[in-house]
């Protein structure tokens, strides 16, 4: 089973992005991987709600936790659908979706984002694409993002170091999880430094572990499209499919 979390940069100032916007991608992923795909919504920060982190990630955690006891479509009967297995999850986070998943799967020191051990046990692999991980570094590259969405989402702070996924440690019970960090050379909204930092951080966390750094992969060469355009590319589907097949057959 795959759960896909697509980024809306946390905020909604013009158009509310919705899960239905990614229906075609979900169908392509399901067909390519022969597994169910779930694309959830989560609350967005808007001028009328003043919603701030970690509320968005809490929505994600609530959804993931509920999947552990969900019987699946049609009460769990596979029929013509791919079988739903809540004990075998692959999570896919794009843009801020990557930051939300990292804040849950890694130790963000936020009591509101502590996942149940059953969820951590169920996660087999994680795909991070065009992700945001280090907010201070992001603002160094894109200073206008502070006014666009960072201040509304995280507050007006002198530093956002405490929210940096590149500083978070492994949670107990996550050493079995495999990761792949994907970044397109054509992304104009999030620079490659974000993915480079996260890749090296995850490698350092897994150094000396049961599988070593071999369970932390990267793909920074195959995608050429812009930030969200890569989601419509066949190459992106192939990268996700190959990663899931590799982890599943290990």
Where are each of the predicted segments found?
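Short beta-to-alpha linker loops that shape the active-site pocket of alpha/beta-hydrolase fold enzymes
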Residues: 8, 41-48, 132, 225-226
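Primarily recognizes the serine-hydrolase "nucleophile elbow" in alpha/beta-hydrolase
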Residues: 65-141
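C-terminal catalytic histidine-bearing segment of alpha/beta-hydrolase fold enzymes
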Residues: 50, 182, 189-250
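Short, proline-enriched alpha-helix->beta-strand connector loops that line the catalytic pocket
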Residues: 120-124, 172-179
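Mobile cap/lid helix-loop segments that gate and shape the active-site cleft of serine hydrolases
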Residues: 131-170
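Short, surface-exposed "cap/lid" segments of acyl-processing enzymes
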Residues: 1-32
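Residue-level signal for short, function-critical loop segments
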Residues: 8, 95, 132, 185-186
